[in-house]
């Protein structure tokens, strides 16, 4: 599906963005491994999260969608061997966290995915899990899906420092460590998003975490986990698109309520504020360890910045839309130390640069990042290849709203990966200037 957007639009709305994708995935996983019945409200019914549900159903977890809730009947890590291959579709989170969970199970499983997921490296997860005693076989190409997994009931505890901060790798090791024969210690620097730790602590797992001298440490002891009740807040990664839309469009403002404000996720707010963005955070409350609140953003004159290395893990999913903001800013923006972007749904360094250039922006690809020379006057409408990457498609759509003329976003239906009603909200909440 291609989408046409007539530019020079503005927004003055309260926008309801989808539930948080990271927490939606983890709620199904924790519910499946818990003892008892987990109730989940405000779940994200996107392609990625549905892949997680289907995989756990294939592992014999009883998951029921009941009105606006999901009911998960957990069996305390007593999963059953799947009768078919576990298809993770396009979801890296499903795949990598499942590798950790399946490492605790004695049966064999095979995981696969779509053509995009098959290009994403998996040894970063399988190497430390192998050290714990799980067995992996790459069935087609070394380091890539499909993978055969054989777990163990006698996993060895691990002390492991992540070479590159990654919430997915860290989470896989945490899940496996819950069933290891002793204390495991996982370290990373800087800290990546910590939803797994917070949610497992809420479910009664024996987990401690702390930061010292720039190093984040998680200590895990073998644990049973209890069922939870959770209402999932809105996803700040999805909110970021409408925040930037308000910042770069003349006479615009947006209000987003019930949004996740976990400090490991608010890097996009911090960097935009450094660029001069008028953004306010209001009505903050703590829900089971997660901060939730209201975000208000208004049209702003932005300036270029150099993004700090320690901020990269906190903005890794938002870099395409941050780059759009940078194209409208005055001066140079440098985003570096972001090699992880090379192995996302697309090579997001390359595809973000190509997307910006399509609109006439001056930008350059760096080895591990990008450099953008902002100039609103140079920007024009465009036909943009999304590369079937949901975050590229949405970032391009926001840019199309702010430039003059009609733009076309190719393969725009990929937004269903994380934000199925993105275009409904975009067109209903904006109007021509």
Curated annotation (Swiss-Prot):
Give the domain of life.
Answer: Bacteria
Quaternary structure, from the entry: Monomer.
Which gene name does the record give?
A: aroA
Hey, which pathway is this one from? Answer: Metabolic intermediate biosynthesis; chorismate biosynthesis; chorismate from D-erythrose 4-phosphate and phosphoenolpyruvate: step 6/7
- Which Gene3D superfamilies does the record match to this protein? Enolpyruvate transferase domain
Say which family it is in.
Belongs to the EPSP synthase family.
- Where is 3-phosphoshikimate annotated to bind? 21-22, 26, 166, 168, 317, 344
> Where in the cell is the protein located?
Cytoplasm
- Its name, as the record gives it, is 3-phosphoshikimate 1-carboxyvinyltransferase
Q: What Pfam families does this protein's entry cite? A: EPSP_synthase
Per the record, the GO terms for biological process are: amino acid biosynthetic process; aromatic amino acid family biosynthetic process; chorismate biosynthetic process
One Gene Ontology molecular-function label: 3-phosphoshikimate 1-carboxyvinyltransferase activity
Catalysed reaction(s) here are: 3-phosphoshikimate + phosphoenolpyruvate = 5-O-(1-carboxyvinyl)-3-phosphoshikimate + phosphate
Q: Read off the HAMAP family from this record.
A: EPSP_synth
């Amino acid at each position: 599906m291609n989408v046409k957007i007539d530019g020079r639009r503005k927004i003055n709305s309260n926008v309801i963005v989808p539930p948080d994708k990271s927490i939606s995935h983890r709620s199904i996983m924790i519910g499946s491994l818990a003892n008892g019945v987990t109730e989940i409200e405000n779940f994200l019914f996107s392609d990625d999260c549905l892949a997680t549900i289907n995989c756990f159903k294939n592992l014999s977890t009883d998951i029921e969608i009941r009105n606006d809730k999901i009911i998960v009947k957990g069996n305390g890590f007593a999963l059953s061997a799947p009768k078919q291959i576990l298809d993770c579709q396009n979801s890296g989170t499903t795949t990598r966290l499942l590798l950790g969970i399946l490492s605790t199970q004695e049966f064999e499983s095979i995981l696969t995915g779509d053509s995009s997921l098959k290009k994403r490296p998996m040894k970063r997860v399988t190497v430390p899990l192998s050290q714990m005693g799980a067995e992996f076989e790459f069935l087609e190409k070394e380091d890539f899906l499909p993978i055969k997994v054989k777990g163990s009931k006698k996993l060895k505890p691990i002390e492991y420092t992540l070479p590159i901060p990654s919430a997915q790798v860290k989470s896989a090791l945490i899940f496996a460590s819950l069933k290891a024969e002793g204390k495991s210690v996982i370290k990373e620097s800087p800290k990546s998003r910590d939803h797994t730790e917070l949610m497992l602590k809420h479910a009664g797992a024996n987990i401690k975490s702390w930061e010292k001298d720039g190093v984040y440490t998680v200590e895990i002891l073998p644990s049973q986990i209890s069922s939870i009740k959770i209402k999932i807040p809105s996803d700040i990664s999805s909110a970021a698109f409408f925040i930037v839309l308000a910042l770069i469009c003349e006479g615009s403002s947006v209000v987003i309520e019930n949004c996740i404000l976990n400090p490991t996720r608010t890097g996009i707010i911090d960097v935009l504020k450094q660029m001069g963005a008028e953004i306010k955070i209001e009505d903050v409350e703590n829900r089971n360890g997660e901060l939730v609140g209201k975000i208000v953003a208004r049209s702003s004159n932005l300036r270029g910045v150099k993004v700090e290395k320690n901020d990269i893990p906190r903005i890794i999913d938002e870099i395409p839309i941050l780059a759009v903001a940078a194209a409208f800013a005055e001066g140079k923006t440098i985003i570096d130390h972001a090699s992880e972007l090379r192995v996302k749904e697309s090579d997001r360094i390359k595809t973000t640069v190509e997307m910006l250039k399509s609109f006439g922006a001056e930008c350059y690809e760096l080895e591990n990042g990008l450099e953008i020379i902002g100039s609103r006057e140079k920007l024009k409408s465009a036909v943009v290849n999304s590369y079937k990457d949901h975050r590229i498609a949405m970032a391009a759509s926001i840019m199309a709203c702010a430039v003059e003329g009609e733009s076309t976003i190719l393969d725009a239906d990929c937004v269903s990966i994380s934000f199925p009603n993105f275009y409904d909200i975009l067109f209903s909440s904006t109007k021509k200037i």
